[in-house]
């Protein structure tokens, strides 16, 4: 355990988010504010617990643009989890939104939030998560809800789907959603 702890490297997500913002600048081709960040973009946390880390991130990257946060609660009915989310804004006036979080496993929080944000007059929706796993890809992948999803290669599993081939039987086919961008930091 000691050897493992001695070799742990803590990675600050500011480098990742700076790369995401640069990618968005190129894609959006919008007017830029101070530090060359897009001015038509809102940085958002997916829940109240993520807002404090988001504010620390904003300080590190010198973000002076708009920020927002959602809050959520879980209701347990019939053994299933129902997510209830609230957003302080009800009209984003066409601004694009970048949701920043640390991990996406199944994507339920982000799917629910994306549905709500679409009803709040937002522009494009983007998601940046440091760690992403393949569990969120099944029949209803989180990438279906966003214009673009960003993740690092820290916990990126190859996306595969099963298909039947007449000559070879069941095959695993490597597939990556077109709107998923992996930023290599490791």
Could you say what each language-model-derived stretch is?
Residues 1-186:
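PRPP-associated nucleotide enzymes
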């Amino acid at each position: 355990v000691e050897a493992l702890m001695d070799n742990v490297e803590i990675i600050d997500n500011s480098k990742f988010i700076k790369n995401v913002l640069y990618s968005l600048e190129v894609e959006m081709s919008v007017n830029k504010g101070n530090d060359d960040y897009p001015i038509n973009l809102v940085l958002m946390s997916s829940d109240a617990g993520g807002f404090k880390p988001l504010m620390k991130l904003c300080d590190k990257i010198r973000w002076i643009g708009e920020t927002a946060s959602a809050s959520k609660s879980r209701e347990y009915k019939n053994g299933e989890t129902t997510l209830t989310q609230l957003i302080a804004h009800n009209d984003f006036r066409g601004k694009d939104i970048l949701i920043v979080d640390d991990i996406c496993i199944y994507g339920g929080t982000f799917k629910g939030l994306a549905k709500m944000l679409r009803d709040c007059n937002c522009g494009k929706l983007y998601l940046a998560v440091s760690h992403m796993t393949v569990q969120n890809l099944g029949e209803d992948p989180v990438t279906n809800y966003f214009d673009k999803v960003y993740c690092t290669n820290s916990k990126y599993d190859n996306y595969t789907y099963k298909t039947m081939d007449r000559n070879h039987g069941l095959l695993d086919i490597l597939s990556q959603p077109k709107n998923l961008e992996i930023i290599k930091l490791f």
